């Protein structure tokens, strides 16, 4: 177990190691045991982060001209679906040279725009380098080895990852840029946004719909919006908009719950609650600007949720949603220095669509 910790919102969280580190360790151990009689319990690898890992070997299978071994993915306190999955590597005797391929449970890339070529196994560049480097440390001179990375439960697990969205089929990806999993890593989430956008751009998609999560995705599908252009941006609105600028995307659609979208109206481009908590404040401010009674404004402000506030606002002040929507559109344009224009859809869970800028004549 990796005894490395980070502080997240005052909580001490344990770091872990990536699927890439597991694959590198399993491949190194299998190669060593292929050419040596010794049976290993642990294998040491270096990571790009500069941290040395001592990884426990879970299972070993030896046969004529091959060795297979596995390492359990330990993501620490990161809530990743691959945590606890068994990553296997098979080392086979080869006359000369080094070859790496994927096997069962490792996805195959079916689209361009990702870090791996279309048609190849989804073993990302850094893990590829890690595996090769570690294997060659123990590969005897003038001998060769064929390494196959496989994940028996990979196809099942992959259904709950980003891979179906990225058109990676048949299994999980072998990932990791540092070899270390940092719990709640913003970098990992942002990388998912960038990857998804790149893949869609390469496949010729021009109409992008940005969503905060699964609820927004369901609402957008319900509205009949083409899901091929969906991008889940989570709380990273600013990052997603910067990706648009980098890729010369001039026009987007953003669909979001009124609670999240209010934050953008206030100029917050990271909508996580610990970064930006203004929601009811924006509703109260707009009502004040519309001339609402002070007691009514206070009632809205005292509500626990924006859903509750929307129920109270009713039809009398329904123009509030247009006003907020227009502000969001302006904030997005200002944030991107005029390079990105956005259409906006605001919704609540109970009332449905509150305002859709595309319906404004």
Swiss-Prot record:
It is an enzyme of class 2 (transferase). GO terms for molecular function: cobalt-precorrin-5B C1-methyltransferase activity. Its EC number is 2.1.1.195. One of its GO terms (biological process) is methylation. Pfam families: CbiD. Keywords: Cobalamin biosynthesis, Methyltransferase, S-adenosyl-L-methionine, Transferase. It catalyses: Co-precorrin-5B + S-adenosyl-L-methionine = Co-precorrin-6A + S-adenosyl-L-homocysteine. Pathway: Cofactor biosynthesis; adenosylcobalamin biosynthesis; cob(II)yrinate a,c-diamide from sirohydrochlorin (anaerobic route): step 6/10. Belongs to the CbiD family. This is Cobalt-precorrin-5B C(1)-methyltransferase. The gene is cbiD.
């Amino acid at each position: 177990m990796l005894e490395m910790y980070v502080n997240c919102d005052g909580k001490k969280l344990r770091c872990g190691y990536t699927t890439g580190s597991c694959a590198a360790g399993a491949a190194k151990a299998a190669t060593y045991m292929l050419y040596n009689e010794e049976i290993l319990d642990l294998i040491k690898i270096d990571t790009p982060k500069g941290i040395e890992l001592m990884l426990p070997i879970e299972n070993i299978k030896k046969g004529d001209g091959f060795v297979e071994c596995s390492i359990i993915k330990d993501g620490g306190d990161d809530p990743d679906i691959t945590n606890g999955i068994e990553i296997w590597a098979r080392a086979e005797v080869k006359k000369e040279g080094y070859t790496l391929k994927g096997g069962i449970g490792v996805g195959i890339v079916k689209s361009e725009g990702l870090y791996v070529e279309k048609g190849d196994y989804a073993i990302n560049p850094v893990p590829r380098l890690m595996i090769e480097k570690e294997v060659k440390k123990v590969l005897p001179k003038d001998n060769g080895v064929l390494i196959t990375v496989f994940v028996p439960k990979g196809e099942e697990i992959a259904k709950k990852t980003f891979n179906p969205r990225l058109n990676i089929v048949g299994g999980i990806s072998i990932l990791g840029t540092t070899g270390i999993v940092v719990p709640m890593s913003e970098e990992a989430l942002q990388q998912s946004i960038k990857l998804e956008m790149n893949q869609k751009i390469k496949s010729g998609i021009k109409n992008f719909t940005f969503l905060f999560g699964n609820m927004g995705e369901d609402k957008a599908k319900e509205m009949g919006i083409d899901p091929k252009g969906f991008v889940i941006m989570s709380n990273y609105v600013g990052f997603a908009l910067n990706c648009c600028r980098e890729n010369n995307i001039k026009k987007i659609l953003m669909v979001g719950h009124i609670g999240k979208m209010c934050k953008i109206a206030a100029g917050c481009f990271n909508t996580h609650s610990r970064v930006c908590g203004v929601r009811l404040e924006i509703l109260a401010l707009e009502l004040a600007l519309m001339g609402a009674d002070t007691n009514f404004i206070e009632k809205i402000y005292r509500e626990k949720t924006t859903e509750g506030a929307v129920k109270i606002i009713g039809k009398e002040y329904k123009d509030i949603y247009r006003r907020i929507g227009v502000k969001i559109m302006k904030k997005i344009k200002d944030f991107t220095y005029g390079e990105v224009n956005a259409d906006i859809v605001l919704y609540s869970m109970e009332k449905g669509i509150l305002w859709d800028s595309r319906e404004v004549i």
